[in-house]
């Protein structure tokens, strides 16, 4: 029977992040295909293959062809247990993605070869840098026309502020794309497009082998040798330690849609990516190999099964062994829970599990007991760090349009806020509920889900606000004076913390100048 240490060593828990339409969900599908978790991949946003993408769960995702919630999937690959967190790709869904990055040990970033580094990728990379998360980059869509691979490497370094080292290299791109030379394994993989089936590799292990010319032609063979010479002269050798410290990103090239370059990425990933890492709590650092179980809730998902109004709390196991029906303490309330039906996920399929190990994500049925950031332990009081709320970018008042469905609306808003879809503030001046999101699409998602999952109808009333700032002060009198002066702009969040709603940058700066005793924060963690 495998020991705790053995189970930890074989686990790889990571997120795939990208700008919308870079091919992230497609890459996830193909990784599942190689893991034997699915046998046919569903082409995203295409009717050519009738199966809908495995990791897109919610009805609105299926309609729009974008992922709007974080999906969790696990599968075995060789000796390894892989846990993938597929994050929302749409630019409006940063908040859920920020939180997901607190539950993973490494990240794969997908970049479109035609578009290079985009805004969302930069923002997510900042969160990775805050936590020194190891990053691998997959440059996708090589079968389409795009930019020169060396230009892409330069942009990755300058925009993401991280060193890069190619571990595979494309032979031409677009219509002339012939394949990829795998630098890490010293093999040549020739391109044969296939959207559904796993490709066999065609291997040529030595670049001086005349079969290289036979495979790709004299011109491309000469260019490949020249490029590889340039790479070894310009880029540092791959240093695994630098990668694990979050300072160096290995880069792979391929076409996820055509299942090309994906296996090379996966084979290298399982070898170099970190197994579960220590987690920082306020009290101390928790190491995965500790005997006592601990874990935290990083996401709550309502109505994963439209037939049942159920919630699932996603718990990341940080240390020890999680066991079904064992008593675990919820640190926030001091209550003890025995979880009778914990689940593991393969996209839509949920299986009841008897045990889980560090790095695993366990689904816990929730009837309203759990909140994002909750800690479960075998008794020790631990508070894990790194689940802040950030100031939303857009704000709207939510109005009930059907007074007969007030209860349903209240319940729906509460559950959606528990999921972290958006943030809710209560305006202290007029008592109205204010919803804050990272972008416009989230308002549409909330409205759609309230109607289809709770039978409640709402409308939105826009309000022009610049930022929501959490405020605090060591001087109680100064805090009261500020709240009195700014009473029209004061709100509380769901935890009852004071929030100042600044309607412009100028108003915020004036408030900071006029009230030096008040500290203003753009994140709830201070």
Model-found features: residue ranges?
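Structural and coupling elements of P-loop NTPases
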Residues: 1-526
């Amino acid at each position: 029977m495998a020991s705790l240490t053995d189970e930890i060593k074989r686990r790889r828990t990571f997120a795939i992040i990208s700008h919308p339409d870079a091919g992230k969900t497609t890459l996830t599908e193909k990784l599942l295909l190689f893991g034997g978790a699915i046998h046919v991949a569903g082409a995203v946003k295409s009717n050519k293959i009738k199966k809908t993408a495995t990791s897109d769960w919610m009805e609105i995702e299926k309609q729009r062809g974008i992922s709007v919630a974080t999906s969790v999937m696990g599968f075995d690959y060789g000796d390894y247990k892989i846990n993938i967190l597929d994050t929302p790709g749409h630019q409006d869904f940063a908040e859920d993605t920020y939180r997901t990055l607190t539950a993973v040990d490494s990240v794969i970033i997908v970049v479109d070869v035609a578009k290079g580094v985009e805004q969302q990728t930069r923002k997510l990379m900042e969160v990775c840098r805050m936590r020194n998360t190891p990053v691998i980059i997959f440059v996708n869509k090589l079968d389409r026309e795009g930019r020169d691979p060396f230009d892409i490497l330069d942009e990755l370094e300058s925009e993401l502020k991280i060193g890069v080292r190619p571990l595979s290299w494309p032979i031409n791109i677009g219509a002339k794309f012939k394949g990829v030379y795998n630098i890490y394994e010293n093999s040549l993989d020739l391109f044969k497009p296939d959207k559904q089936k796993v490709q066999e590799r065609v291997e040529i292990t030595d670049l001086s082998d005349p079969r290289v010319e036979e495979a790709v032609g004299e011109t491309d063979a000469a260019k490949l040798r020249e490029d590889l010479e340039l790479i070894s002269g310009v880029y540092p050798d791959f240093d695994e330690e630098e990668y694990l410290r979050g300072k160096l990103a290995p880069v792979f090239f391929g076409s996820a849609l055509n299942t090309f370059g994906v296996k090379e990425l996966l084979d290298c990933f399982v070898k170099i990516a970190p197994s579960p890492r220590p987690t920082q709590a306020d009290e101390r650092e928790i190491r995965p190999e500790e005997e006592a179980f601990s874990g935290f809730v990083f996401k709550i998902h309502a109505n994963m099964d439209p037939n049942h109004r159920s919630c699932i709390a996603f718990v990341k196991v940080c240390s020890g062994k999680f066991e079904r029906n064992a008593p675990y303490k919820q640190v926030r309330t001091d209550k003890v829970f025995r979880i009778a039906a914990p689940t593991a996920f393969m996209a839509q399929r949920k299986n009841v599990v008897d045990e889980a190990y560090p790095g695993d994500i366990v689904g816990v049925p929730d009837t309203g007991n759990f909140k994002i950031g909750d800690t479960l332990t075998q008794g020790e009081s631990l508070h894990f760090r790194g689940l802040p709320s950030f100031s939303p970018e857009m704000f709207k008042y939510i109005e009930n349009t059907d007074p007969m469905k007030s209860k349903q609306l209240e319940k729906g808003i509460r559950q959606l806020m528990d999921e972290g879809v958006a943030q809710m503030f209560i305006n202290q001046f007029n008592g109205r509920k204010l919803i804050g999101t990272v972008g416009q699409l989230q308002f549409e998602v909330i409205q759609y889900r309230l109607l289809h999952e709770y039978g409640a109808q709402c409308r939105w009333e826009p309000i022009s606000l610049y930022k929501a700032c959490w405020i605090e002060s060591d001087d109680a009198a100064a805090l009261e004076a500020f709240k009195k002066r700014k009473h029209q702009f004061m709100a509380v969040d769901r935890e009852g913390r004071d929030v100042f709603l600044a309607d412009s940058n100028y108003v915020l700066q004036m408030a900071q100048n006029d009230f030096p005793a008040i500290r203003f924060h753009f994140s709830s963690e201070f």
